[in-house]
Amino acid sequence: MNKLRQSFRRKKDVYVPEASRPHQWQTDEEGVRTGKCSFPVKYLGHVEVDESRGMHICEDAVKRLKAERKFFKGFFGKTGKKAVKAVLWVSADGLRVVDEKTKDLIVDQTIEKVSFCAPDRNFDRAFSYICRDGTTRRWICHCFMAVKDTGERLSHAVGCAFAACLERKQKREKECGVTATFDASRTTFTREGSFRVTTATEQAEREEIMKQLQDAKKAETDKTVVGPSVAPGNTAPSPSSPTSPTPDGTASSEMNNPHAIPRRHAPIEQLARQGSFRGFPALSQKMSPFKRQLSLRINELPSTMQRKTDFPIKNTVPEVEGEAESISSLCSQITSAFSTPSEDPFSSAPMTKPVTLVAPQSPVLQANGTDSASHVLTAKPANTALAHVAMPVRETNPWAHVPDAANKEIAAIHPGTEWGQSSGAASPGLFQAGHRRTPSEADRWLEEVSKSVRAQQPQVSAAPLQPVLQPPPPAAIAPPAPPFQGHAFLTSQPVPVGVVPPLQPAFVPTQSYPVANGMPYPASNVPVVGITPSQMVANVFGTAGHPQTTHPHQSPSLAKQQTFPQYETSSATTSPFFKPPAQHLNGSAAFNGVDNGGLASGNRHAEVPPGTCPVDPFEAQWAALESKSKQRTNPSPTNPFSSDLQKTFEIEL
């Protein structure tokens, strides 16, 4: 009966251990590499575990999951928790569990996150693995029950997936040439190489370089054995590809680590820094708009500056470039700019300024035997200290050496001395202190007139005196003095000698001097005071034997109140708040301190040198007023409104 009973029972398969079935394992390994290895399983579930590895951890997890399934089955009957029938796919990328009925993806696990896998020793078909959960960072154990196969086969398939993943990773590292050196003491690492995937051509070049390095290393070892050791960089130069130069440092590093893969270096031409746009070289200089902290003006743009430098504007008027100005010349320009001339009617009350004994820019000329106004009005014997005329300081260097103490005073100047000559000689240097300028039309016309005069008149020359450029003693310092005090031809009280400046000599034949354009201007006897250029031409080409009397226009300020600021106690009409009138800096005549007090207290008539006829004082006064009016009508360099003055006549009987 037992035999009959056993004949109806299902016979069990003969158990064959997994070790005796290598042919199945080989098929599993190929299936894992191709991604076609799958096993029908029952997914028991997953539980959290305390450790990342260990067979006993996996066995405990299987027991817990089977116990929970039995508890739910016994409590709820047939509605208990059942194992899910699924298919386990094993590949080198990861483990995937797909529901057999719904084809839903239950588990998707990467191989890199799996830390341990093992079969169960209590259940032959049981299999489990431990992985790291990516979200919660906890250790999770997933358990399966194989339907047809044993747990050992599933575990072997997962092991093959581990091996395939490791081989793939090593192949990537070998291709990209990345090596990492870890420093345990400093918790740092050094990475060498690049993760960029190389092409077949680059791989061939790399193999060629490795072969050359090995040959160089072999030659180096041979030299070391035969003779004294030499530096690794001094070995025979090995040919390398143009895109992959091999420096000596790489060769020396290969000596230490033969398994290291050399890095590919770019050629020197590609390593040179290049700008984005090189149309404007000024962008790379200091004027770059990206290096500024302030707002950029349109004229300061690099592009504008580049256009200006590339296409300079041609100047139609040729100008002679002067020599580079020194610091002293700049200081003198600043001093002359801030020192207000005494002839400016818009300046404030007169005040003591640094003065210099200068003469008018144009020489005093003789008008056909008649002296000009500034010489006719000489009435005082010139035995007192000469007062300095207040004019802007025009020396090139204000700190230059001054004449010695012997020139502090000029005493006993006789009427025949040529004081105007010395001043005329000193004036061109002062005029040319700044720079040379382009000759204007007036200069060219004056040059033509001078040529004609030179052809007709003999040139009178005299030895110039040393000009006085040093201020006088404090007792003789006087403020800017006007030509006349009070009304014309009215006697006034005598003035102290230290206050009233001396007068000029009666007649001074002037010498030739250079004009601003460098042409010499000879002295002539043609009157240039208060006449128009047409009158001067008429005088030049007319008869020279007749004395001419000009009819000047008198300024209202001269006619009505010829009072100018001067600090003296004898003049009742002096007002320190009266603004001084304009005086033409480049005028033909200056009075240099001649006042009416000199006319009253001194000689009424001018001292006339021999050879000249006496001049009527009225004509002299008229010429003086004319010259002063001529000076005032010309525009002042510091006052743009000085040419708006009116001219009137006034005749006193």
UniProtKB/Swiss-Prot annotation:
This is Protein numb homolog. Keywords: Cell membrane, Developmental protein, Endosome, Membrane, Neurogenesis, Phosphoprotein, Ubl conjugation. PROSITE patterns: PID. One of its GO terms (cellular component) is glutamatergic synapse. SMART domains: PTB. Residues 213-223 have a biased composition (Basic and acidic residues). Regulates clathrin-mediated receptor endocytosis. Plays a role in the process of neurogenesis. Required throughout embryonic neurogenesis to maintain neural progenitor cells, also called radial glial cells (RGCs), by allowing their daughter cells to choose progenitor over neuronal cell fate. Not required for the proliferation of neural progenitor cells before the onset of neurogenesis. Also involved postnatally in the subventricular zone (SVZ) neurogenesis by regulating SVZ neuroblasts survival and ependymal wall integrity. May also mediate local repair of brain ventricular wall damage. It is a peripheral membrane protein. Disruption phenotype: Mutant animals exhibit severe defects in cranial neuronal tube closure and die around 11.5 dpc, but neurogenesis abnormalities are limited. Mice lacking both Numb and Numbl genes die around 9.5 dpc, with severe defects in somite and vasculature formation, neuronal tube closure and axial turning. Conditional mutants, with expression abrogated in neural progenitor cells from 8.5 dpc are viable, fertile and exhibit no obvious phenotypes. Residues 33-193 form the PID domain. It is found in: Cell membrane; Endosome membrane. Its main location: membrane. Phosphorylated on Ser-276 and Ser-295 by CaMK1. One of its GO terms (biological process) is positive regulation of neurogenesis. The keyword Metal-binding does not apply. The gene is Numb. The modification Phosphothreonine is found at residues 102, 243, 438. Expressed in subventricular zone (SVZ) neuroprogenitors and ependymal cells. InterPro entries: Numb/numb-like, Numb_domain, PH-like_dom_sf, PTB/PI_dom.
